[in-house]
Amino acid sequence: MKLNNLVFDFDKFAFEMANLKEKKHFDYLVTIVGEDFGGEEGLGCIYILENTKTNERTSVKMLAKRVGENDFVIPTVTGIWKVADLLEREVFDFVGIKFLGHPDM
């Protein structure tokens, strides 16, 4: 299955993800995969979303913003999908990306 790889600006990420849920009905966050894309891209995540009524899936690629020397951050989506709480903490543990606004980070 080939998925779209949507990419959003850092500052609009949370807004665009909320639009995917509310307007496009991607009501289920399947997973978040933390990754080192290498080179200039650096660390980031792939989000897999599903519309459970149509079974349509899409993916979103979000590059982490470097803060300081060794910190990488992405805005949290815990306010949009509750399951993001655990998925984001797992990415933090394995890859080191911090999620801005996460309730337990």
Model-derived features with residue positions:
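Terminal low-complexity/charged segments
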Residues: 1-105
